[in-house]
């Protein structure tokens, strides 16, 4: 298994650790305390195919998986100590293709996805009951999104993509969604953007 096909995310207080992976059940979560303690039971309804990305909501009450094959994203309630709840309904408007990256915004009200084909990113309002309305796609889209993240204050969203310019950044507003794409960096990354992250204070990318 290549490392970029195993994605992990820590839950509340780093007590739960999730990995999205190839091969059923596609998502695996462990209790973690000074090392691996035990594996949680798999969800009763699995993602439909290979898991590529995973993220917990900031409050640790939801977990979402980006994966291959429709519906491309699957999300569940999460309870520390007991694990997966019943799968949320799929979004009414699905992402355009296989999703490789996934991220909640810092306050847990938006869920963003990096897509490899048919557009490169999608974002949805997120509520306590699951997926809300899909935001309009940004006007300028790079090709083949691979990773996605929000700035610590939630006002920026950055996409790593396989093809030039390899990294793209947009303003983001909860009410209006994506703003106009920022200019590309004067010196581009040397190749495909497989991962992307802001520094803790949001001043570096």
Task: Label every model-predicted segment.
Residues 1-12:
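Enriched but not universal
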Residues 11-13, 58-59, 106-107, 152-153, ...:
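Residue-level detector of Asp-centered blade-edge/turn motifs that repeat once per structural unit
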Residues 22, 68, 116, 162:
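Short loop/turn segments immediately following the C-termini of beta-strands
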Residues 29-37, 75-84, 123-132, 169-178:
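Short loop/turn segments immediately following beta-strands, especially the blade-tip
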Residues 38-45, 86-93, 133-140, 180-187:
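A short beta-strand motif characteristic of beta-propeller blades
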Residues 50, 98, 144, 192:
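Beta-rich catalytic cores
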